[in-house]
């Protein structure tokens, strides 16, 4: 299952590997009629083969949160381990990378600009005792995922095994991936 916002390089690698892709569109906001972002994007993903658009689910608008939803809601996994989904930047990442999401976008903002500190706030993950930088997009993604986790059924257990980032808090257990695997192996 691939979302319409999957990185094109990942899609190309999957196709070269012979993976059959099933597309979905990850919805971001609640449907509020024609002014809704969901309505607008549903119009954008319509193609000749699919006049009604691609299948869509309410997922927080990003690939990681979509995978979390599919894991417990569709696949009925009781424990969902997040790997590589940190919704933040490492403090060691260059600010040019952070400000452009690693794209070649010409954005002119100095790190000393007061706006920079408001838009790119620093945080601390107590579960892994590490610092991170949140940009506006990752802040929103992290906030949505945390809210979805808190609202999920009590039987859903979310583990952050990414070993960093902004995903921690209520109903999220932070543990390194090796420990997660060892715990799962000892509790079949």
Name each model feature, range by range:
Residues 1-188:
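Metal-ion/cofactor- or nucleotide/acyl-coenzyme-handling active-site neighborhoods
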């Amino acid at each position: 299952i691939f979302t319409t916002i999957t990185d094109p390089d990942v899609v190309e690698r999957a196709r070269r590997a012979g993976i059959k892709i099933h597309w979905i569109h990850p919805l971001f906001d609640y449907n509020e009629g024609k002014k809704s972002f969901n309505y607008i994007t549903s119009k954008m993903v319509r193609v000749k083969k699919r006049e009604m658009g691609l299948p869509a689910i309410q997922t927080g608008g990003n690939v990681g949160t979509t995978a979390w939803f599919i894991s417990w809601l569709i696949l009925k996994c009781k424990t969902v381990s997040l790997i590589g989904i940190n919704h933040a930047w490492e403090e060691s990442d260059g600010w040019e990378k952070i400000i452009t999401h690693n794209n070649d976008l010409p954005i002119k903002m100095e790190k000393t600009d007061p706006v920079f500190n408001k838009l790119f706030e620093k945080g601390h993950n107590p579960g892994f005792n590490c610092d991170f930088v949140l940009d506006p997009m990752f802040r929103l993604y992290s906030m949505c995922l945390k809210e979805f986790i808190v609202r999920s059924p009590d039987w859903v257990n979310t583990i952050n095994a990414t070993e960093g980032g902004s995903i921690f808090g209520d109903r999220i257990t932070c543990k390194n991936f090796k420990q997660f695997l060892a715990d799962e192996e000892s509790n079949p």
